[in-house]
Each structure stands twice: as structure tokens, then as C-alpha cells.
Amino acid sequence: VSEDPKITLARDSYDALAKGDLDHVRDNLLADEVVFHVPGRGPLAGEYRGKDQVLGYLAKFTEMTDGSVRFEPDSIIPGEDRTVVTVRVQGERAGRQLDDRGVHVFRITDGKISERWSYPQDLYNIDAFFE
């Protein structure tokens, strides 16, 4: 039994981020008109449109955690046009620890990530961590 391609795509995105391989993310995983929705009031919150903005967000997230950020997917549940991932996010910044669980919802179009919504378990903690 082969793995659902939506699961493979989601897993590949987390693997590429873990390796810092943003070129692979850009060239193979993101749709041209990709949109990331990031909740909150912190410096990373907002809506990122297009590959350049999304990759800028991912690079800034990594930079603000001194490269310590880790996204560990617990489960990946494919749907018809959305794929849901329960994920643990960990990192360190200025001596503070981040350890949060949340949900990422991906819209996958033509085999690429076209949209992602982030739903952290503790949004207040995420905002405080990045202040």
C-alpha cells in the first residue's frame, strides 16, 4: 500500500525545514501563489503571499530562534482538498524555551502546498516568545 501523496508532501515539507533546505521547499513543494496564514500579534503574525514572502517568513522564524526551531509532525490526516497535521513546535530564543503543540492545515493543489493555516495550542505563549 503506497502512502497518500498528500501525506508524503506534508512530511517532505517538515523534513526539508528540518534540514534548512528552503530551495527544495521553493522548487518542489510550494505553489506559485501560495499563502500562509499566521495568527497572533507577534512579529511573525500575518499573511504571507507568494513563494518569496512564505520563504521569508520561514527564514525569519529560523533566524529568530537561532536555527533551533523544530517542527515535529505527530499525525498527518489527508482530506479531499485539505490535509491536517498535528505538530509539535520547539525552539529557543534569548534563553527562553518554546514547546507548543498545534495544528497546521494545508490546502494542496496540483501536488503542491497552495495554502497553510497555523493554529497553535497556546497563541499567547507564541506571541510572548517572539516579542
Regions found by a protein language model. Give the residues of each.
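C-terminal and inter-domain tail/linker signature
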Residues: 1-131
